[in-house]
């Protein structure tokens, strides 16, 4: 019996033994080592050691591995209606033989999980666009963040795009409406961001360049270009300088007005990269709620 899994961006750079425990169950290290050595567990059809790190787009094959089916299926599968499929297909910016690019809506996850049901992977898995294949998630975009998002159509494209993101050859531009004013209109943030993995504290370097596009005494419109790709990087960095993003319910001050807007005012505005000497540039139009808050706060976006 063979069972295959596609590694999504959530587990990028995670050791294979930890991936197994996270996705298949809390197996003893000895059993995992034995299964890897015997070839019952392979990555991209190759035997690997337990220290091998998986990458987004990798295919993990289990051959007669005694996994617990109930644990494997802990992620809730979302079955979209035809209306939901059509709504998301209408958000597509580009559709070619290797990948699609869409303007993701706020409030929808990239992939399913124990906390998320409605997600893009399950939606497009049932779209005619992926009739002869399946969607591959190649990078992260928070559930509440809108904007440019890419999904590969086949394994080779997934591996290529993932490597471009990992090698920082994809140039991303984000827009955010944040509270208050920054000290400098142009600059770079270099921070040590802390996250926790199974109660273990992990500190990671985070770099972002930024430019203030417009501001007043109450709020600012910021353009940000992350150099590193840490979880919640932009949200954490703006919070750290005292200017949390409007609508951020996690990184905020206690006196933040919840009634101002329920949407996170963070938008993946543009992505640029090169494939075989061809330049790809994709821009996602601002959501209506973002433009509405700009108008309410009397902020001007140069391209709007």
Language model: regions and residue ranges:
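Short, solvent-exposed loop/turn motifs
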Residues: 47, 231, 279-281
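RNA pseudouridine synthases
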Residues: 1-188, 192-198, 204, 215, ...
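PP2C/PPM family metal-dependent serine/threonine protein phosphatase catalytic domain
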Residues: 198-206, 250-253
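Short hairpin/turn module used for nucleic-acid contact or packing/dimerization
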Residues: 279-304
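Long C-terminal interaction/binding lobes of large macromolecular proteins
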Residues: 210
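Pseudouridine synthase
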Residues: 116-124, 155, 218-273
